[in-house]
Amino acid sequence: MSAHEAGSSGRRRPATFHLHIYPQLPSAGSQTSCRVTATKDSTTSDVIRDVVASLHLDGSKHYVLVEVKESGGEEWVLDASDSPVHRVLLWPRRAQKEHPREDGYYFLLQERNADGSIQYLHVQLLAQPTAACRLVERGLLPRPQADFDDLCNLPELNEANLLQSLKLRFVQQKIYTYAGSILVAINPFKFLPIYNPKYVKMYENQQLGKLEPHVFALADVAYYTMLRKHVNQCIVISGESGSGKTQSTNFLIHCLTALSQKGYASGVERTILGAGPVLEAFGNAKTAHNNNSSRFGKFIQVNYLESGIVRGAVVEKYLLEKSRLVSQEKDERNYHVFYYLLLGVSEEERQEFQLKQPQDYFYLNQHNLNIEDGEDLKHDFERLQQAMEMVGFLPATKKQIFSVLSAILYLGNVTYKKRATGRDEGLEVGPPEVLDTLSQLLKVKRETLVEVLTKRKTITVNDKLILPYSLSEAITARDSMAKSLYSALFDWIVLRINHALLNKKDMEEAVSCLSIGVLDIFGFEDFERNSFEQFCINYANEQLQYYFTQHIFKLEQEEYQGEGISWHNIDYTDNVGCIHLISKKPTGLFYLLDEESNFPHATSHTLLAKFKQQHEDNKYFLGTPVLEPAFIIQHFAGRVKYQIKDFREKNMDYMRPDIVALLRGSDSSYVRQLIGMDPVAVFRWAVLRAAIRAMAVLREAGRLRAERAEKAEAGVSSPVTRSHVEELPRGANTPSEKLYRDLHNQIIKSLKGLPWQGEDPRRLLQSLSRLQKPRTFFLKSKGIKQKQIIPKNLLDSKSLRLIISMTLHDRTTKSLLHLHKKKKPPSISAQFQTSLNKLLEALGKAEPFFIRCIRSNAEKKELCFDDELVLQQLRYTGMLETVRIRRSGYSAKYTFQDFTEQFQVLLPKDVQPCREAIAALLEKLQVDRQNYQIGKTKVFLKETERQALQERLHGEVLRRILLLQSWFRMVLERRHFVQMKHAALTIQACWRSYRVRRTLERTRAAVYLQAAWRGYLQRQAYHHQRHSIIRLQSLCRGHLQRRSFSQMMLEKQKAEQARETAGAEMSEGEPSPVAAGEQPSEHPVEDPESLGVETETWMNSKSPNGLSPKKEIPSPEMETPAQKTVPAESHEKVPSSREKRESRRQRGLEHVERQNKHIQSCREENSTLREPSRKASLETGESFPEDTKEPREDGLETWTETAAPSCPKQVPIVGDPPRSPSPLQRPASLDLDSRVSPVLPSSSLESPQDEDKGENSTKVQDKPESPSGSTQIQRYQHPDTERLATAVEIWRGKKLASAMLSQSLDLSEKPRTAGAALTPTEERRISFSTSDVSKLSPVKTSTEVDGDLSAKKPAGHKKKSEDPSAGPDAGLPTGSQGDSKSAFKRLFLHKAKDKKPSLEGVEETEGSGGQAAQEAPARKTLDVPSSQQHRHTTGEKPLKGKKNRNRKVGQITVSEKWRESVFRKITNANELKFLDEFLLNKVNDLRSQKTPIESLFIEATERFRSNIKTMYSVPNGKIHVGYKDLMENYQIVVSNLAAERGEKDTNLVLNVFQSLLDEFTRSYNKTDFEPVKGKAQKKKRKQERAVQEHNGHVFASYQVNIPQSCEQCLSYIWLMDKALLCSVCKMTCHKKCVHKIQSYCSYTGRRKSELGAEPGHFGVCVDSLTSDKASVPIVLEKLLEHVEMHGLYTEGLYRKSGAANRTRELRQALQTDPATVKLEDFPIHAITGVLKQWLRELPEPLMTFAQYGDFLRAVELPEKQEQLAAIYAVLDHLPEANHTSLERLIFHLVKVALLEDVNRMSPGALAIIFAPCLLRCPDNSDPLTSMKDVLKITTCVEMLIKEQMRKYKVKMEEINHLEAAESIAFRRLSLLRQNAPWPLKLGFSSPYEGVRTKSPRTPVVQDLEELGALPEEAAGGDEDREKEILMERIQSIKEEKEDITYRLPELDPRGSDEENLDSETSASTESLLEERAVRGAAEE
C-alpha cells in the first residue's frame, strides 16, 4: 500500500492509499490482482464496488472482502462498514506497501452464496488432510511418525530418525526440541507468536519436559535450579552464523528479568533490557548468512541475591570485528547504527551533525548500496534512542556519540592522490569540505589533521623524522584511525552500560550473590573469503565445543566410572588436537603469528611458510598449493580455508602515536575521553579541571559583585532608602509613630490567641511578610515536581575502578594507545586468548545449560527446511552422540545426604543417609531398576524417575497435611461434642429438678387447698351455728324488749298527758337540748375519697413566703369539720381522724400506682392513642389558680428539700371559700411522666424540662413507708393547654441522696432566681447520677425498671437573657469559674449574632419522631433513644410546622434542639467537610485561654476533626453514620483524653460540643451540602491509575523488549513500543485493540460464572460488589465506618472474638440486605469478626493470587526503600475494585494502629491478623512453601501499614501547617479591613525558617522589639493589592488543604525524592503564594 498526500491541499483532501485485491473467483480468469484507491474513511462496500467495476464482474452477485494473515493462519471476513485501510495499517511495514502474497498479508475477493456461505476454491485442498486422517483411522494408510518433543524418546536412534523428527516438528512451526536437558532450536527466519508474556507465566516453575519445549522453559529451569542449589548457572548458546543465537539470547534475558522482577522493574532490569538493543545497533551487521549477525561476542552475567532478586549485571565483549567498518563483502552491510542514524534523524539533527545520505559515504556504499527497508530503519532509530535512555545516556551524550559516528563516516570519504607537479613526493588529501567537516566534528585543527593523515613521524635516538605516506599507507592509516575510533567508542559504550548495571552497594559491602551467565558468542563461520577475524571466531567455537564435550561426555562418564556403577563408554569426537594446533605453546599458530609480527621485514608469505613448516604433519593442518596464499584447518565443523593476507597487520592493529596525539589534543572532552588510556585517570583529570573552572567562575563573580557594590556606594542614593527608614527615631512622639506602635501592640496581643501551642509566633509570621510582595524566585509547589537537572548515576572514580577491574582482560583498544612506549603492547590474538580463557574459567565455575542453534537454510527463507544443511550441523555438533549419552545417562544426581534431605518425608524417621536406606526406599516405591543406580556416594536417577519421586513426595506431604487437618478437626469436634454432652446433662438435671420441685409444689398446693377447704367448711358450720344462736337470742331479746317498750310507752303516754294538763302555763321560749344535739346529724359527712391527695404540695407552692412543706406542717386543728364530728347515736368505738386520713392517703397512693402502671402500658402500645388520653386528662384535671406575679426565689432549695424522703406526713387541706372558690375534683386519669431518670451519686436533683414557664409545676412526695420507694405521682396544670410541662421525678433514700449531694456541686448554697435554669453541666450530672443510683438500688418498682432500660438525654437549658447572674458556668466549682467563664461565655454569646434567629428548630417534626421510633439502641450514651423520645413527646401536641408563639428565646434549650439533631442523617461527605471547617473556626476562637477545661476541649475537638477528615476523604464519598454516631465518637475521644490527663469532670466539654453541633445543624440546610461539580470535586480522587480494565482483564502499560504479537489483531508489536499487558492472564495487545477484545479474562471470567448461582455479599468476588457509584463494597464500608465510630478505642479490637451466635446473626443479616442492618444492636467484637470473615470468604483476596509471588519477591529485596517501591508497584497493577477496597481497608488499619496505646493493636499485630485474609497463597501452590511464606506475607502487610501510617502523619502535619497559615492570613486580612483608612500598615519580621518551631514563647517586650517594621514595608505599599494577595492565598491554602485531605487514604507509590520535595513544600507554606504569583505573571 502506497500513500499519497494532497500537497498543499492536504488539509482539505485526505490521503489516498492503493490497495491490491486478489480475486478468488471462478470468473476472474487470468486476472491476478486488482489495484484500487481508497482512503481511511472508505468502507469495505466501497472497495468491493470499485473492484467489481474494475474487473467488470457481475454486479448482481454478492461479494465479500477477506483479510488473510498467514502468520496467524486465519482469514477474517470484513464487515461492510469496516475500513480496509485501517486493517492494512496494522500489518507489518514490509507488507503495507504492495502487500504481495509472498509476505503473507493480503486481501481476497470471494463470492458469497445466497445463504450467506462463502465459496472457497481451495476447499478441496483443505479437505485432503481430513480425508487422509480418515484413511489412517481405517487402517488403509500407515500412521505418521509420532511427534517426539524429546529426541531421547525416539524408538530407534539414528541420523535419519533424528532429522525426520526435527523436520516434522519444524513443519508444524515447533522449532524447539529437547535432547535431554539440551535444547535444540532451529531458526525459522520468521517471527512466531510464541514469546508473549503469557508464555513466561506458563513455563514458570515447571518441570523440564512437562510442557512443549521452549527457550523460556530452559531459562526457568536455570533460574530455579540456581535458587534451589545455590550454585551459579550458565547458558551456553552455540551454533553457526545465522542460526539465531542473538535472538535466543534476547529471549533468555527477557525471561530471566521477567522471573526476577515479577511486575516491578527496577533500574537494573530496565538497563539489562535496554542494553541489548544498544549493543546490537553498534555491534551487529547484516551479512550474507544473517540479517542481524553479531560481529562481537558478549557474555552477560546477571547477579542475583539468594532470594532471586537481581543485584546487578556485567557485560563482557569479545573481539569486535573492526575490519567490517572499512570494508564489506557483497550483499553485506556495515554496522546497523550508521543506517539508523542516517535514515532516522530529524532535519535539525542532520544539519547539526552534517549528515548525508548512506549512498554518499564510502564506508557504506562499496557495492552499489540498495536500502529496501528504509521505513523499518527509521523506526529502529527511534527504538535505539529509547534503549539508550533506558541505559542512562543523556541527550547531550547521545549527541556526542552521533557526532563521533558522523566523523567516522567522513573519514571514509577522505581521498588521496599523488601530487602531479613538484619534487614533493607527498600526497594531496581532500576534498576540502570533508576535511573542514571532519575537523569540526572532532574539534581538531585542520592543519594538524591533514598532516597526520599524510605524514608519518618517526623518532630516532637523535632525530625526529617526518616521512610522507605512500598511497596504500595513507589509506591504511586513515582506516586504522576510523577503526580505532569506532572500537574506542564501542568500548566506552560497554563501559557506560556496565556502570549503569553496577549496583553501588557492591562497592560498600560484600554480599554473597548467585549468577546466571548467558553467552552469545559469534558462531562458526565459513565464508568464501575467511581472514583473521574468522580464524579467531572459529577458535572460540572450538573452545566452546570442547567445553560442551567435556561436560556432556568426558566428565560425566568419568563420574560414572568413579562411582562404580555399570556403564558402557560412548565414543565422541574430541577436538583437543585442533585447539592445540592453534594455541599450544610454543608452536601454536597464534604464537607463530606473534613472532612473525614482531619481525620488521616479515610478510604474509613468510608467515604462511612458517605455518607449513611447523605443522606439515598435523592432521588438523592442511596445506594448499604453493601459489595460493592460504591454509586449511580441519575444525570440528569441517574444513575452513583461511586467506593469509593481512594476518600480521590485523594482529598488530593499533593507532599510530601521531594519530593518538591528534585526538587527545581535541577540544572535545568526549573525544579525549574515548582515546584516554585509563578511564579512571581521565575522569580524575576531568574532575580537577571542573574544580578549577568553578573556582575561576566564582572568583570572577565575586569580582563583578564587588565592582557593582563600589559603584552603588559612589552613586547618589534614592530619597526613600532603607537607611532612612531605619534612622527614624524609635522614641518619636509623632502621631504616625504612635499610631504605628499602638497598632503593633494590638496585633501582638491578638496574636496570643492564635494556635501557637507554646511555639514562637515569629515562625509563622514570616509567611505574612511574603504575602505583601511576592517573589518570583520561590518556585517550589506542592503539585509540581521539579525536573531533575542533575542526572542520577553519575560516574565516580570508585565505581570506575571496580568496573575496570572486572573487565580488565578486555582492553583490546586501550592497550593499543601507548605513546612512545619501548615495550610493545600485546597483540590482538594474545588479548583474545586472555579474554577467552577468562570466559572459560567463569563457565567452569557454573553448572551449564546448552542451547544448540541450527540454521534451517542458507538462503534465509521463511520456514524452509534444508535437510542436507541441517544434517551437516547435526553431525559436526555430535547431536547423535549427545542424544545417546543423554538417553543412557542419568540426569539427576544426589549425594546420600542430599537425597535424604530432599526425600526425608518418604524415608523412615531418623534414618541415616546410607546406601541401604535409599535402596530400601526405591524398592518400596517400585522404581524401575533400569532407571536408577546407587553408586559409592551418589544416587543416579533418570529424569522420569526423579519427577515421579517428586510427585510422590508432594502427595505424601499433602496426605500428612490432610491427616493433621483431620486430627485437628477431630479434636475440635470432640471438644464440641463434650461441651454439647455437658450442656445436655446440665439441661436434663435442671429439668429433672424442675419436675421434682413442680411435684412438691403441686403437693403442697393440694394440701394447702385441702386445709383451706376444710377450714372453710368448719368456719361455715361455726358461723352458721353461731348465727342461728345469735338469731334465736336476738328474737328472744327483741320480744322481751318490745314487750318492755310497749309497757314503757304506755306509761310514758300516760305521764305526758298528765304533764300537759299540769304544765300548760309554763314558758315556751327555751330550746330543748335534744334539738341542739340533733343539729350535726343534718349535715352529711364528706366522703374522704372526694378530697385531693396531694393538695398540700399546691398549698406549699401558693404560700407567700415560699416555705417548704417541712416548715409548714399542718396542725390537727386545720382538719375539716367533718373530720372532727362524731355521730351522736354511735355506741361503738370509731377510729380517730388521723387513722382515717392515713387510710385515705394509703388508698389514694395505691390508686395512683395502679394508674401509673396502666398509663405506662398504654403509652407503649400506640403513639396515636396518647393524644386523646392527654386531652381527657386535661379536661378532668384539677384546676389550680395561677399566680405568675410572685417570683419563686427559693425554687432550687424547695426542690432539694422536697426530694428528701423523710418528710413528715402531710394532711389534705380543704381551703376556705375565699381561697378555693371551687372544690377540688379528682381527675379521671393521672398522666405520669414515663421518662424516669435514674439517679447518679453526683447529684440528688432533677430539673424540670420547662421550669421557666411558671410556678405551676407540682411536686409530689412519696410516703416514707412505701415499700416500693420510688413510685411517684405528678399533676400537670398550665393555662395554655397546647403543651404540658414535663414531669419531675422524685426518689427516696435520704442518706443516699445526702451522700451523693455532697459529692456533687453544693447547689443548696447557691439559690437560684425564678428565671434561672440548670446549667448544661448540672443537667448532664443529673443525667449521669440517675443511671448510677438506679444500679445501686436493690429493690425496683416497675417504673424504675422502665427507667433503667432506657438511656436518658440531659435536659440542657439556656438561661434567660434578662438574668445576668446565671450562666453556663454557674454550676462549676468556685475555683474554676473565673478561668473558664470568659471563653465559653464568648462562645455562646456571639453565636446568636451570626446564626439564624429562627425558632423553627425548636419544634419537633413528625419525620424525626417517626425515624426515632424505628431505633432503640440499648447503649448508655448521651443521646436520647427513640423509645425515650416517644415517651417525651407523648404528652406534647405536635405543631406540624407552626411556631409556638407562647415560647420565648430563653425557653429554647439545647437539649430540645439536640433531640432533633441527634437523629439527623448525614447525606454526603460535604456535610462532614463543612462541620470540620465549622469546628476549626470555633476552636480558633477559644485558643486564647489555657484553662484545663478549654485545653481538653480544644485537643478533643482536634482529634475529632481528624476523624471527620478521614471520614469524608474515603473513596466512596458516601456516609452511613449520623450525628448520633458523631456525638458518641466525641464522647469516647473526650473520655480517653480525660483519662490520660486525669480529668474527672468532662460534662462541660460535652455540653459545649453538643451546643456547637446544635448550632451547626441550625446554621446550614441540606442544600448547602450538595456537592458541586468543579475543581474541588475532581480532587477527591487521585489521578487515573495506569491500569485499564476490560472484560475482566487488568491491563497495564508494558514496553516490548523482544518480538511479540498482539493477541487481538495478530499483528506484530515493534520493539520498544508501548503495549498493554494483562497482569492476570498475561494477555498482550496494542493500546488501540483493547476495546475490540471480546474474550473475558481466563481467570476472572471463570470466577464470575462459578459465583453467579448464589447471589449475596459473602463469598462473592469484589468486582461483583462494586459499581461506578459504589467503589467499595457496601458491607466493607459499613463495617469499617461503624468500627471507626465506636470501636477504635476498644482494647483488643481485632484480637478478641465475638459471640458466635451474634456473629452468625449479623452475617446472615448482612448477607440478606446490608442497608437495613442496624450495627448498633451488635457488639463491636461481633462486627470485627464478621469483617474478618468477609475478607476470608472472598474467592480471591484483595491482594490477588496473580500478584502473590510479586509481593513475596518485593519483601525479599535487600533495602527497605526498594521493598516499598516494589510493593507499591505491584499494588498499582491490582484491579480497580481490589485496589480501592484494599486502599480503604489499609486506611482503616492505619487509624486503628494510630491508637495503639489504647486498643493495643500495633501494625505488627494487625498484620498477623489480616495478612492471611489479604494475601493468601494460591490453592495449587506447594503447602510446604506456603508455610514458609507466612513470615513474608506478614512482613509485606506490616510494611504497608507502617508506610501508610508515616504518610498519614506527614499529610496531617501538612494540614495543620496550612490551617495555621490560613488562620494568620485571615487575621491579617481582618486587620487590614478594619484599619483600611489608616495611612500606615503593620510590618512583620522577615522570615528565617519557614516552618513552625517548638521553641518557647518569648516575652511580649521581646516580641515588640523584634516584630519591627521592615524597611520596604515602611516605605508604603498598596494595601488593596495585599488584600487581594491575602484572599488568593487563603483560597489557595483551602484548595491545598482539601487536596491533601482527599489524598489521605491513597496508596500512593511516589518515590522518596518526591516525598522529600513535598515535605519541604508543605513545611514552607509561603511557597503556595509564590507559585501562584509566578503562574499569574507567566500568564500575563
UniProtKB/Swiss-Prot annotation:
Expressed in which tissues: Expressed in testis, lung, thymus, brain, liver, spleen and heart muscle. Detected in lung, testis, spleen and liver, and at reduced level in different brain regions (at protein level).
GO terms assigned for molecular function: actin binding; actin filament binding; ADP binding; ATP binding; ATP hydrolysis activity; ATP-dependent protein binding; calmodulin binding; GTPase activator activity
Modified residues (N-acetylserine): S2
Gene Ontology biological process terms from the UniProt entry: actin filament-based movement; establishment of cell polarity; lamellipodium morphogenesis; macrophage chemotaxis; monocyte chemotaxis; regulation of Rho protein signal transduction; Rho protein signal transduction; Roundabout signaling pathway
Residue stretches making up the IQ domain: 958-978, 981-1001, 1002-1024, 1025-1054
Keyword RNA-binding: no
Residue numbers binding ATP: G239, E240, S241, G242, S243, G244, K245, T246
Region (Interaction with RHOA): 1699-1704
Location of region: Tail: 1046-1980
CDD domains registered for this protein in UniProt: C1_Myosin-IXb, IQCD, MYSc_Myo9, RhoGAP_myosin_IXB
Domain annotation Ras-associating: ranges: 15-114
Site description Arginine finger, residues in chain: R1695
Record has Zinc-finger as a keyword: yes
Protein name: Unconventional myosin-IXb
